[in-house]
């Protein structure tokens, strides 16, 4: 994939998140014009705002060669399905059964459009320009409004039957933890226990306000470690990248947050799997995204770039 503005085609990108839509036009992470719109509960309105902005940028900068859409889900990613391009059974108010891809295609009928999950997009962004570069097998997890994950296997994104929904893994409960969880589908799944809304419900305050010694952080980190250990056992990744707003960990701090997760992952695995990556090199095994908060929109750029260049990941 071309990684420099002089080599890469001009593309549009949409990162459709549960809280906000991030839109960009450019050629690579160093060459982006971007804006944001609140997701709200009126899909028609926000999609009109998004597509109108992309049209304005196209008028100013020239014809877009492709558009990449990386969206929250669940999604229908099967091109032969009558609901291909739809957000399907999301708990987000107003967005169930929204034809997000169709809205983009109607606005840009002559421009090819790539479509995938937001977390697959972020994984692809890290694969092209971040901590997944040079790796063929890794996992990207985001912990924010919800929890989701993208998986790279053999240098290609994993899709399979539907797409990964690792945020709904069912985890062993910690002794004495009676928190019911906030997931409307599963209650105390990983997302129900560890998402931003879960931290708010458990601690009575948002993540950025929770003091470092609060029990909510102890449980949060232990459950994340359980989930990472499960991913290691099932997928055998070369690296686990954890993004999303919760990983900043407020007053606890991102460095301490990751250090504690790594310690608990080692404890959970209990030296069953033998690899330097899981022992002395674990500091480079469980890491935050190199692209930071831009992983998702950079992934949408990468989706569009690959389509424009007729490459498949």
Task: State what each model feature region is.
Residues 81-97:
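A charged helix-plus-loop insertion that forms the helical arch/lid used to bind
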Residues 121-128, 149-151, 170:
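Adenylate-forming
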Residues 1-66, 75-83, 102-113, 125-135, ...:
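ATP-binding/phosphotransfer module of carbohydrate and carboxylate kinases, centering on a glycine-rich
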Residues 15, 68-72, 116, 140-146, ...:
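Short beta-strand segments
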Residues 158:
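Charge-lined substrate channels and their catalytic hotspots, especially those that engage the 3′ end
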Residues 162-176:
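A short, polar/charged loop-to-alpha-helix boundary motif
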Residues 36-37, 92, 162:
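Short clusters of small/polar residues that mark proteolytic maturation junctions
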């Amino acid at each position: 994939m071309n990684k420099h503005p002089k080599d890469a085609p001009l593309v549009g990108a949409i990162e459709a998140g549960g809280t906000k839509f991030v839109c960009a036009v450019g050629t690579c992470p160093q060459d982006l014009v971007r804006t944001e719109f609140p997701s709200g509960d009126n899909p028609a309105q926000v999609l009109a705002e998004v597509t109108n902005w992309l049209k304005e940028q196209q008028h100013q900068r020239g014809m877009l060669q492709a558009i990449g859409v990386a969206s929250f889900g669940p999604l229908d990613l099967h091109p032969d399905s009558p609901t291909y391009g739809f957000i399907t059974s999301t708990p987000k108010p107003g967005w169930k059964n929204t034809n997000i891809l169709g809205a983009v295609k109607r606005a840009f009928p002559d421009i090819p459009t790539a479509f995938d999950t937001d977390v697959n997009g972020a994984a692809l962004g890290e694969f092209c320009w971040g901590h997944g570069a040079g790796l063929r097998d890794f996992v990207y997890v985001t912990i924010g409004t919800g929890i989701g994950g993208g998986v790279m296997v053999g240098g290609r994104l994993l899709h399979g039957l539907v797409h990964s929904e690792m945020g709904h893994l069912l985890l062993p409960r910690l002794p004495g933890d009676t928190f019911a969880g906030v997931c409307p589908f599963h209650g105390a799944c990983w997302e129900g226990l560890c998402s931003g809304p879960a931290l708010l419900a458990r601690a009575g305050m948002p993540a950025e306000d929770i003091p470092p010694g609060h029990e909510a952080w102890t449980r949060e980190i232990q459950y994340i470690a359980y989930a990472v250990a499960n991913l290691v056992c099932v997928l055998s990744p070369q690296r686990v990248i954890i993004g999303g707003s919760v990983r900043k960990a407020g007053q606890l701090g991102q460095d301490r947050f990751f250090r504690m997760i790594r310690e608990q992952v080692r404890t959970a695995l209990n030296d069953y799997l033998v690899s330097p990556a899981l022992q002395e090199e674990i500091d480079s095994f469980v890491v935050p995204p190199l692209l930071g908060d831009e992983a998702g929109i950079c992934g949408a750029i990468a989706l569009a770039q690959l389509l424009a260049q007729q490459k498949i990941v």
